[in-house]
Structures are given as C-alpha cells and as structure tokens.
A protein has these predicted regions:
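A structural signal for short loop-to-beta-strand junctions that line the ligand-binding cleft
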Residues: 95-97, 126-162, 192-196, 294, ...
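Extracytoplasmic "Venus flytrap"/periplasmic binding protein-like
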Residues: 61-130, 164-166, 173, 265-269, ...
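Hinge/lid segment of periplasmic solute-binding proteins
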Residues: 103-153, 177-179, 187, 206, ...
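Extracytoplasmic/periplasmic substrate-recognition and gating elements
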Residues: 60, 166, 238-244, 283-347
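Long, aromatic- and glycine/proline-rich binding clefts that accommodate carbohydrate-like moieties
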Residues: 133-136, 292-296, 345-393, 400, ...
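Short, solvent-exposed loop/beta-turn-alpha elements that line the ligand-binding surface or hinge
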Residues: 119-130, 212-233, 282-287, 296-306, ...
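Conserved N-terminal structural module of periplasmic/extracytoplasmic solute-binding proteins
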Residues: 2-107, 299-302, 323-326, 410, ...
Length: 429
C-alpha cells in the first residue's frame, strides 16, 4: 500500500473516532482519553516457549510502575507477523499499538505509512546509548521508526580443540586462510574444516568482503552483476569445493545437519549467528563452553570483514490515537532500557543493542561475549523497503551457482533480472 492510501485509511479511522488498535476503542480527542487508564496491545514475535516468559515478566513490571497503562500482551509467531501486521494496518483495523519487528521490515512498514516516527519522543530519549549502526538501520528517509531491542550478526564459530589438534592457533582472518586451514584440519584432525549453509543471508559476508552489497542506494544500482559481487561469489564457490570443506548440503534438513555436525565435532567451523549458541553449548563437543571460538567472519580481497546485522526493533503503529501512542512510547522506552535489556540478555541469551547493557552478568555468557566482540564488523541494511525481498531471488540463484547448475556470471545476471522486478527504478551494472 502506498503512503497516500495508508493516510486515507488513517484519516477515516480517526473520523469515526475508532482506534485502529485492536485492543482498545479510545478516541484521540478529549482530555479524558489522555488522562484516564489506557490499554495498549503489544505483538511480541519472540519465541513463545523460550523467550516470551521474560517479556511477560517485564510487562508486569511495567504495569506496576505505570498503573494507568495496561498492556494486552499477544504472542504472535514470527513467521506470521509481517503479513498479519500488514493486513491489519492496511485495513485500518486490528493492528497492535506496538510491534516487535524484524529489522528488515521497518523500512517497508515506514514507506507504507504504517509506523509513527519516534524522534523526540520518550522512546528515543536515550538514542545516543544505542549502537549507532543499529539506529541507522532503524531509520528511513531521515526519520527514526524503531528502537533496537535485540541484535545479532554472523560470525565464524570454530572448535578450538580441533583447530589446536591441527596445529592452528588462531581463527582465519581471510577466506584464503580459511581454505588453507580447512585442508590442514582434514589432513591432521580427520574431520572437515568448514561447512557452509547455502543461504543468501549467509553469503552476504562474501559480498561485503569485496566492498559491495546487493544494492547501492545512493546511486540506485543493483550490485549483483558488479565485478566485486562476481568476485565475492566466485570466492565462495571456490571455497566450498576446496579440500577439507564439507560437501554442500542442499536438502530440506541441511541446516540441521550442519549444526549437528558442528556440535558433535564432525566439522571444525561454520558461519552462524548468536541464536544458535544455546544449542551449540548442548553439543557433545562444547560441554566445556570455552571450546567454542567466535571470530569475525573472514575478510575478502577488500581487506575488511563484514556480516549482516539482524535483530528486532520495537515500532509504534501510526493508526493509534494520541493516548495510545504516548503509552506505547513509554512501553518501548522501558523495554529497551539498559535495565530491561540486561534482564532480557541474561534470561534469553540474546545480544543487547546498547553498550551499557553489557554488564558483567551479561558477558558471563561466553556466547554473548563472543558476539559482542564481532558486532563492529556488522553491516546495517540499506534503508530500502524492498531490500529484504532481494534475499529470495539471490538465494534461488545461489543454490544453482553453488551446485554447478549455472555459472556465477549467469546466476548473478538472473538475480539482477528478478531484482529489477522488485526495484524497477534501480539500474543494473
């Protein structure tokens, strides 16, 4: 939906004095509406079993501190949330006041007029305390539409004991070093040195390593066909066919198979995110947590390592009335405070988005401490509403490239053609 249509829906909703929030029916007019008790709805997309209990406890704490605000907490499956929110916001009915949004959704929601800017509100009062690349990622056309709640990135996870057995004392810092280490590990330790998940998100470090991305926003260009992108994917293709690198697994269970192999010591290193550290520590090779090494992804020929930044932002719905927006801003500020983020990190083993939340209690978790050290290599996503949609065509062609069904040049050309349908105003290289 275009911004103008969204605005029309919002105007209609206000005209009939009905809150667009599904949890309440308060009008935006009148002092009583702003002074009296208000109930806001929060859609939480965290894991309902392992993470939601922490958020429910924080909501209860918030309500005790703010007796005039009640929070209708709703756990919404992450896989359904983007479509569900879009449908409700487009209809002007049933959308929550606050949403835990994937960082990749924010630009699209903002472009469609579904979110309210948070600049100058209580939600953004401590903006300077957050990792600035995360603030950049939550900004669209110069306005801040989300407050970073949790973050993540990719890193090289490696088995220190296997590396030591092969006579390797440090993690590789370039793809060429990783290739050489994999061969040495296979020869001296008898297991594969590296395994790769053939997913476009996991291929991004190979683009960043050549100083490029999927798009160039400033010049409105698609980068898939650029010399740098071609070089990056050629580097990846050469790596996965090198001695000591596990055979590419493109089956439906491929992701799980890679993790099982790493956790059991059958593979020495993988590219992975912090969401898997809890599972890794349950593996037979990591009963001693200090055996897990976490390093920045290797660098490409540009000499710089780079990995995509993921995570979630808290956003506020533009269709909520003034009283509900004010209450939403308070909730967002509370949930993203240093104290709340410390609680979330210690309970859920997720990465905080602000440095003052990395307390000694938080960094006592070696997974969090390890990923904190590599966050500086994180690359914020460009502020383009269609950016996340590009992972689809990129992933489809990447599988064909890596399995030898098409050349790197042909595959990246195909990605370009498909991407131009999503970004018709972007030129190809």
């Amino acid at each position: 939906m275009r911004r103008g249509i969204a605005a029309a829906v919002l105007a209609t909703a206000i005209a009939v004095s009905a809150s667009a929030c599904g949890s309440s029916g308060s009008s935006a007019s009148g002092s009583a509406a702003s002074a009296g008790p208000v109930t806001i709805t929060w859609w939480d997309t965290s894991d309902a079993t392992n993470e939601a209990p922490t958020y429910k406890a924080l909501v209860a704490q918030f309500e005790r501190a703010n007796p005039n605000i009640k929070v209708n907490y709703v756990s919404v499956p992450f896989a359904d949330a983007q479509t569900k929110f879009t449908t409700a916001a487009a209809a002007g009915k049933g959308a929550p006041d606050v949403l835990r949004s994937d960082v990749g959704w924010v630009a699209g929601f903002a472009q469609q007029g579904y979110l309210v800017p948070l600049d100058g509100t209580p939600a953004a009062a401590e903006k300077a305390s957050f990792e600035q690349q995360l603030i950049t990622q939550a900004t669209y056309q110069g306005k801040l539409y989300g407050i970073p709640e949790v973050t993540d990135t990719l890193a090289l996870m490696y088995n220190k004991a296997i590396f030591a057995k092969a006579g390797i004392t440090a993690a590789p810092t370039t793809w060429d070093q990783l290739k050489a280490d994999a061969a040495q590990i296979k020869q001296k330790a008898g297991v594969d040195g590296f395994d790769f998940n053939p997913n476009s998100y996991y291929a991004m470090p190979f683009l960043y390593g050549e100083g490029t991305d999927m798009i160039d926003v400033a010049n409105k260009k698609l980068e898939f066909n650029s010399a740098a992108a071609i070089k990056g994917i050629n580097t990846l293709k050469d790596l996965i066919s090198a001695p000591g690198v596990a055979k590419l697994d493109t089956t439906a269970n491929g992701y799980a198979n890679i993790m099982d192999a790493f956790e059991s010591g059958k593979v020495a290193s993988i590219i992975q995110g912090p969401w898997e550290t809890t599972n890794v520590f349950k593996g037979s090779s990591f009963t001693d947590k200090s055996n897990l090494g976490i390093a920045a992804v290797p660098a490409g020929s540009a000499g710089k390592a780079g990995a995509p930044i993921g995570g979630h932002n808290l956003v506020a719905y533009a269709g909520s009335d003034a009283a509900h927006q004010a209450a939403s801003e308070k909730l967002i500020a509370f949930l993203t405070s240093a104290a709340s983020q410390t609680t979330i990190a210690t309970k859920n083993a997720t990465l905080p988005t602000r440095q003052d939340a990395y307390t000694s209690a938080v960094t006592a978790n070696p997974g969090i401490a390890g990923f904190q050290a590599v966050l500086s290599a994180g690359m914020p996503r460009p502020a383009n509403a269609q950016y996340s949609s590009l992972y689809g065509p990129f992933g489809t062609e990447l599988t064909k490239i890596l399995t030898g069904q098409e050349s790197v040049q042909a595959g990246m050309s195909n990605v370009t053609v498909q991407s131009q349908k999503l970004l018709p105003d972007y030129a190809a290289q």
